Amino acid sequence: MTTQLEQAWEIAKQRYAAVGVDVEEALRQLDRLPVSMHCWQGDDVAGFENPAGSLTGGIQATGNYPGKARNAEELRADLEQALSLIPGPKRLNLHAIYLESDAPVARNEIKPEHFKNWVTWAKANKLGLDFNPSCFSHPLSADGFTLSHANDEIRQFWIDHCKASRRVSAYFGEQLGTPSVMNIWVPDGMKDITVDRFAPRQRLLNALDEVISEKLDPAHHIDAVESKLFGIGAESYTVGSNEFYMGYATSRQTALCLDAGHFHPTEVISDKISAAMLYIPRLLLHVSRPVRWDSDHVVLLDDETQAIASEIIRHNLFDRVHIGLDFFDASINRIAAWVIGTRNMKKALLRALLEPTAQLRQLENDGDYTARLALLEEQKSLPWQAIWEMYCQRHDTPAGSQWLDSVRAYENAVLSQRG
């Protein structure tokens, strides 16, 4: 540890102590908050089932930066590089299309054995795993419908895929000793004016009920459902709307997933957290950055990311909110994208933990909104960066932009060889 860092740390501790904040306790709390990194940033959501296939489901990865992972070994190596540059606890979020098998496997026939390499790797890297059925980029999703499909056989195929995915998720939780959160998102919707909006939602409701009918140990597996406003090719109607899934999660007591990019551009999920928590047991967050639409840009340390983190901390939702990331930018170095986005999420959590919330809440209860605003703004100038740098130091990760040197070295030695 450098003398300069030690001095900055001591000064920062004193500054925060003056406003009633224990920085050591803040760092202890930060170590209770894993962030689930999404594997699909590493290969532009291609997966290993059919890497040459096109991405469908109304989502899009734009850009053609060289060096993307082409197989599981490369993806895991890239993830290890990213993980080494991010301090504190992490998890990995997998999609079903990232299975490994010597022979083709139908999606309704995936099994835990197809993900055993991921579990072995997760154990070695001390990671929890989360999971997602992949209801897109498949011939039976080509017309834009899956769990709400009017064709009984096609709908049953996707039901069986989600059932099989739940068993994989439970396998993760059982093997790793931490529950896997399995999120169900389907792209179902219509491009233009829709006459019957009711029937597809009724089918989706019934399909989801069948999917979650098998009782699984909550210590191993947690069900979550995710809404969306629209997707490319489904601009006019989305079966799984916010109202649909809020009702479903409330009535079935599943977790609800809020994705930062899945709402109208003027809506923010930070304002939805406290409302949802009144009705549902758990919340899954997909922190992202929508630019005009659900563009899935890399997460910044911006106002909304900070507001999301503050909601979690202010209301002590450590054990009820699961923090995941969801972005995929193919225009920049993919490892750097992981590092930037995940570090920013952790920075936002740290800044929230360094807030004198009790004091601010008292001012609010007293009706002293002048002091509330003044202190909220003044705390932005407190030396949180020194606390972050100490946190990085304790976790043997670079504190500042030095991490980029490691990414560039890896790019030159490894990524550049992939063509």
UniProtKB/Swiss-Prot annotation:
Binding-site residues, Mn(2+): 262, 294, 296
Keywords: Cytoplasm, Isomerase, Manganese, Metal-binding, Rhamnose metabolism
Plastid keyword on record: no
GO biological process: L-lyxose metabolic process; rhamnose catabolic process
A Pfam family recorded for this sequence: RhaA
InterPro entries membership: L-rhamnose_isomerase (IPR050337), Rhamnose_isomerase (IPR009308), Xyl_isomerase-like_sf (IPR036237)
Disulfide bonds: none
Cofactor: Mn(2+)
Entry's EC annotation: 5.3.1.14
Subcellular location: Cytoplasm
Pathways involved: Carbohydrate degradation; L-rhamnose degradation; glycerone phosphate from L-rhamnose: step 1/3
Reaction(s) this enzyme catalyzes, per UniProt: L-rhamnopyranose = L-rhamnulose
Entries under PANTHER family matching the protein: L-RHAMNOSE ISOMERASE (PTHR30268:SF0)
NCBIfam families cross-referenced by the UniProt entry: PRK01076.1 (NF002203), rhaA (TIGR01748)
Protein name: L-rhamnose isomerase
Organism: Klebsiella pneumoniae subsp. pneumoniae (strain ATCC 700721 / MGH 78578)
